[in-house]
Each structure stands twice: as structure tokens, then as C-alpha cells.
């Protein structure tokens, strides 16, 4: 059985992980569906798959990674994992993962009547679920599933060197847990070097050393696939990487888990906007009052 991935871009924005609204982590990036369905006359496989999804969604409220096996019979058992980005809070992780089971059915088809596909993967911007039937052919953790590159080159003579340094920081960061954006449940790193913002994430099943190697391989593929493009995202079987170049410097980027800081920023903006509104209102009132007084003065001057 060979897993055939069918890829498409549902939403494209730059930078991919950096400056995005709170709901963007639920946007669909790609899906992969096996070209074979599991015969399921008794409905056992479908029930195991349903139980698998229920367990994965439940655990996503407490952690950013889990691996689950549903069923005991080798012919109907299902193995699955979910992984959330390291900068998502538990509530965001749950919100993201809980969207996927219905998407699997919608994008890959299946059900008790016509059988479910024996393996599938649905990847959103902030999380993914992948599952496979017991005994399904295993693929390399560094097999490339999907990539997207920016349409423009950086036009910066020093870009390659800056990107290389940023890549090195990420490779070390996913191994040591050193990150500007949080982590947990698989190596995660988000940070910047000069004008390059970079992100790396591994599946929680990888150890630190394997994670570093996977991310390194991802960045090598990003260089070969995207050349000097100003941005790129590469998704491998067990890790994914992203980079974005900003000609005027990386803007202030908050991790999605920085709730307090973001709320404080939002309050500051709200106060600033409110202050501008009040100031404008006062100015208008003063202008009206001045106009009225001027008319009154002109009236007296006429006598």
C-alpha cells in the first residue's frame, strides 16, 4: 500500500507563522489521503478511527502532542498522533485539533458504508493529525510532504548568510528548548537573526538529536527548493520549518501563547484610540464654541 499525498494551498500568507490573527492557526495548509480504503463490513475500523479521534482531541486540551492506538486486532487497529505548534496554549491546541476529524471525513471521504482511507494527514497552520492502519508502510521522518516558497527574492547581498545563521540558531534551539516563543511536546524554536524570522517544530516522538537532524534536513530542503526566495515553508513527515525575510527588519512578533502581553498591547491600543477620539471630540467642541463666539462678536459689532 502506498500513501498518495494530494496537496493544495488553501491559504497563503507571509510570514507563515509570525504575524497572524489568533484564528489563523486553524487555516488549512495541506491534506494527504491514502488511495486505498479499508474494507469495513462490520464497522470496527470506523469505530476504532472514531475512538482514536476522540482520544486525540481530548488529550489536546492538556498537551501539545500525543500518540494513540485504537483497537487490538491487527487488521482493524488504528495508530494516530496529533501535534500542536509549540507556541499555542492548551486551549488553542484543543481548538485547532478538534477541527480536524471532520476535515478528514470531508477531504478524504469515507465512512462505514464505503470505508475509510487506511491513512490520512490533515495539517492546519497550528496543528496536525495523522493516522494509519496497523501494518501500514512506514515512511522516513524526513520525507518531504509539502513546500511553498515566496514569489520574490530578497535582493539583499547578505541574505544567504543571515538565513544560514538563523537556520543554525533554530537547529540548536529545537534540541535545547531555547526559543523565543515557548515550546513543549516536541522540539520547538521561533526566533530571529537580524532581518530573518525562523521557526522549527518537531513531532513529539522525536528525541532532541533526531529533532535537530530533521529540522536541519528541512532547512537544507528549503534552501534547495526555494533558493533565495524571501520566504519558505517545508513540511517533512516528522518536522516542519519556516523562514521569512523582512527588508526593514523583523517586526515585533508575539508568540500565540503570549496572551497577557498581547492583551496588554490590545488594551494600550484601545486606550490610545480612545484618547485620540476624546481629543478629537474636544477639538471639535472648541471649534464650534469659537465659531459661535465669533458670530456673537460680529453681531455686537454691527450695532
UniProtKB/Swiss-Prot annotation:
InterPro entries: Cell2Cell_Antifungal, GNK2, GNK2_sf. The chain crosses the membrane at residues 269-289. Highly expressed in cell suspension. Expressed in epidermal and spongy mesophyll cells, and the cell wall interface at the base of the leaf trichome (at protein level). Expressed in haustoria-containing cells. Residues 269-289 are annotated as: Necessary and sufficient for plasmodesmal targeting. Changing residue 287 to A: No effect on targeting to plasmodesma. PROSITE patterns: GNK2. It is found in: Cell membrane; Cell junction, Plasmodesma. One of its GO terms (cellular component) is plasma membrane. Residues 27-136, 141-248 form the Gnk2-homologous domain. This is Plasmodesmata-located protein 1. GO terms for biological process: defense response; plasmodesmata-mediated intercellular transport; transport of virus in multicellular host. Residues 290-303 are cytoplasmic. Induction: By downy mildew fungal infection. Disulfide bonds join 33-108, 84-93, 96-127, 149-226, 202-211, 214-239. Belongs to the cysteine-rich repeat secretory protein family. Plasmodesmata-located proteins (PDLD) subfamily. CDD domains: Gnk2-like (cd23509). Residues 22-268 are extracellular. It is a single-pass type I membrane protein. The keyword Transport applies. Keywords: Cell junction, Cell membrane, Disulfide bond, Host-virus interaction, Membrane, Plant defense, Repeat, Signal, Transmembrane, Transmembrane helix, Transport.
Amino acid at each position: 500500500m502506498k500513501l498518495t499525498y494530494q496537496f493544495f494551498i488553501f491559504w497563503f500568507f507571509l510570514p507563515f507563522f509570525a504575524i497572524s490573527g489568533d484564528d489563523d492557526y486553524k487555516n488549512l495548509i495541506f491534506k494527504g489521503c491514502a488511495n486505498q480504503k479499508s474494507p469495513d463490513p462490520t464497522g470496527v475500523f470506523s469505530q476504532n478511527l472514531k475512538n482514536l479521534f476522540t482520544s486525540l482531541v481530548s488529550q489536546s486540551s492538556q498537551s501539545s502532542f500525543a500518540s494513540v492506538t485504537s483497537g487490538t486486532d491487527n487488521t482493524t487497529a488504528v495508530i494516530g498522533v496529533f501535534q500542536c505548534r509549540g507556541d499555542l496554549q492548551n486551549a488553542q491546541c484543543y481548538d485547532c485539533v478538534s477541527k480536524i476529524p471532520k476535515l478528514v471525513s470531508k477531504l478524504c471521504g469515507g465512512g462505514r458504508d464505503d470505508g475509510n482511507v487506511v491513512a490520512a494527514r490533515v495539517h492546519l497552520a497550528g496543528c496536525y493529525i495523522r493516522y494509519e492502519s496497523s501494518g501500514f508502510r512506514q515512511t522516513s521522518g524526513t520525507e518531504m510532504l509539502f513546500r511553498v516558497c515566496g514569489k520574490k527574492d530578497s535582493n539583499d547581498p547578505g541574505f544567504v548568510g543571515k538565513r544560514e545563521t538563523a537556520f543554525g540558531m533554530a537547529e540548536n534551539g529545537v534540541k535545547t528548548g531555547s526559543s523565543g516563543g515557548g515550546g513543549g511536546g516536541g522540539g520547538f524554536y521561533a526566533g530571529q537573526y537580524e532581518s530573518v524570522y525562523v521557526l522549527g517544530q518537531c513531532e513529539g516522538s522525536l528525541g532532541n538529536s533526531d529533532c535537530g537532524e530533521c529540522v536541519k534536513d528541512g532547512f537544507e530542503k528549503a534552501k534547495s527548493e526555494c533558493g533565495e526566495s524571501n520566504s519558505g515553508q517545508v513540511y517533512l513527515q516528522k518536522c516542519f520549518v519556516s523562514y521569512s525575510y523582512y527588508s526593514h527588519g523583523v517586526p515585533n512578533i508575539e508568540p500565540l501563547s503570549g496572551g497577557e502581553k498581547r492583551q496588554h498591547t490590545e488594551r494600550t491600543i484601545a486606550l490610545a484610540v480612545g484618547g485620540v477620539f476624546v481629543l478629537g471630540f474636544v477639538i471639535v467642541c472648541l471649534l464650534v464654541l469659537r465659531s459661535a463666539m465669533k458670530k456673537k462678536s460680529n453681531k455686537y459689532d454691527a450695532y
